[in-house]
Amino acid sequence: MKLRVRLQKRTWPLDMPEVEPTLGQLRAYLSQALPTWGYSSDARFAITLNNKDALTGDEETLASYGIVSGDLLCLILEDAIAAPNLPSSTVSEHSSVQNNDQPSLATSSSQSNIQDAQLHDSLQGQATQSEVWNDDSVSGPGQHFEAEAVPDVVDVEEGTGYYLAEPMLCSESVEGQVPHSLEILYQSADCLNPCDALIVSIHLLMLESGYIPQGTEAKAVSMPQNWRLGGVYKLQYTHPLCEGGSAALTCVPLGNLIVINATLKINSEVRSVKRLQLLPESFICKEESGENVAMIYKDLQKLSRLFKDQLVYPLLAFTRQALNLPDVFGLVVLPLELKLRIFRLLDVRSVLSLSAVCRDLCITSNDQLLWRCLYLRDFRDGSIRGRDTDWKELYKKRYKQRKEAQRGRHVMFLPSSPHPIPFYPSPLHPRPFPPSSLHPPGIIGGEYDQRLTLPYVGDPINSLIPGPGETPSQFPPLRPRFDPVGPLPGPNPILPGRGGPSDRFPLRPSRGWPTDSRLPFM
């Protein structure tokens, strides 16, 4: 039978050769497997299906509990088991006592060592008991148990999850939570102002980067001796990867800033490497000065990234270069496989920029597999290419074609100027001559009359030379535009060939306006 065993948020497989194993056999197999999972073979545990109710009866088969191959079993360690949540047989089996005055499982932690020795002896020589727990006490022949009230344990994994949620590094800090190492350093440093608190965090960042405080008296749980003298902070370190060289940080407060100067000492020669300015107010809360260290610091993730990227790592790289040592970190020392996986996520400009850094990155950036991946990513090409295809040249060719096509579309759809030059034609506009701003469009005397455009409506002579009466043509006469502010369109007695006034269009001014006697064409 194959089962899955879950213990403290981790799951392992368990194989048993028996077809129908019993609970006792399962317990024996689990005891043998615990050392391989990182636990002691003497660890006491309870077998459950729902992580709460323990299974009892070692002689019962697993099938009687409804357990089949592939099921998930949850183990609860003895230390996290509460007395009210377990059946009587399991509790008595794990906590049987030989003395009359021995306390129950819920006693204080000061007697836990004595209980462990007695519980281990009782597990080997005592069978399963069947006493029943009633309320707060259990009585037996010659034995009196007094059960104390113990709060129910909801989930043994909650305690483990709490400790895992605590940040270990400054880069993992969130609001309200800081690493435990920072709390210890801050409490041992006796900080007097925000600058002191910032230097404490900087010292911890140096320790996280692998630097060791110089001097045998320096400890990781406290600040180095004489780190604060006369308003100037001095910290000295060595690094295991830079034997023969030492680094020193000199921090000087200047107004609201702290200037950090990093120097390198090799063979009594001191070189200035880096300089960084930090604002304590950005990372230290002034109003918080209590014992809660988590409320004093803020934006530790930003501080860690800024300090390490701009000072720590460049200092380490410069030290190894000064000692004529090869690089041990960074993009250059990564395997080729990892470089290609990183390069293929970049755009072409970034890849070309990396190729100009050094010879090694130039060789990596010219890999044909990389350019094939970039070509298939950036261009749609379903054609089959040969094995001898130069993918970089092909990418360059297609890239130039795309740029030329984009440039052609840009010229073709070039928008017209929003403010054309007055009195000059615009060659890109459908109407080269801009309209006059003196009259609105459609008004007599405007653009229509200045540059007259007559459409072809039929007879070019009869349609333009009206005679008496209606024009005897099969095409309608060319009528001029009407004046929207003048009289309504209709028969005009002044124009020849239009007829006289009628009842529908009387010859009278409209709305107080005089009759417009101007000719329609100027």
UniProtKB/Swiss-Prot annotation:
Residues 91-128 are annotated as: Important for interaction with PINK1. Residues 179-323 are annotated as: Important for dimerization and interaction with PSMF1. Pathway: Protein modification; protein ubiquitination. CDD domains: F-box_FBXO7 (cd22087). InterPro entries: F-box-like_dom_sf (IPR036047), F-box_dom (IPR001810), Fbxo7 (IPR047118), PI31_Prot_N (IPR021625). It comes from the Eukaryota. The keyword Endoplasmic reticulum does not apply. The modification Asymmetric dimethylarginine is found at R518. SUPFAM superfamilies: F-box domain (SSF81383). One of its GO terms (cellular component) is nucleus. One of its GO terms (biological process) is autophagy of mitochondrion. Residues 128-168, 380-522 are annotated as: Important for interaction with CDK6. Its main location: cytoplasm. A motif (RFDP motif) lies at residues 481-484. Residues 328-374 form the F-box domain. GO terms for molecular function: protein kinase binding. Residues 88-151, 484-522 are annotated as: Disordered. Residues 88-132 have a biased composition (Polar residues). The modification Omega-N-methylarginine is found at R431, R451. Keywords: Cytoplasm, Methylation, Mitochondrion, Nucleus, Ubl conjugation pathway. It is found in: Cytoplasm; Nucleus; Mitochondrion; Cytoplasm, Cytosol. The ubiquitin-like region mediates interaction with PRKN. Substrate recognition component of a SCF (SKP1-CUL1-F-box protein) E3 ubiquitin-protein ligase complex which mediates the ubiquitination and subsequent proteasomal degradation of target proteins and plays a role in several biological processes such as cell cycle, cell proliferation, or maintenance of chromosome stability. Recognizes and ubiquitinates BIRC2 and the cell cycle regulator DLGAP5. Plays a role downstream of PINK1 in the clearance of damaged mitochondria via selective autophagy (mitophagy) by targeting PRKN to dysfunctional depolarized mitochondria. Promotes MFN1 ubiquitination. Part of the SCF (SKP1-CUL1-F-box) E3 ubiquitin-protein ligase complex SCF(FBXO7) formed of CUL1, SKP1, RBX1 and FBXO7. Interacts via its C-terminal proline-rich region with DLGAP5. Interacts with BIRC2. Interacts with CDK6 and promotes its interaction with D-type cyclin. Interacts (via the N-terminal Ubl domain) with PRKN. Interacts (via N-terminal region) with PINK1. Interacts with PSMF1. This is F-box only protein 7. It comes from Bos taurus (Bovine). The lineage of its organism: Eukaryota, Metazoa, Chordata, Craniata, Vertebrata. The gene is FBXO7.
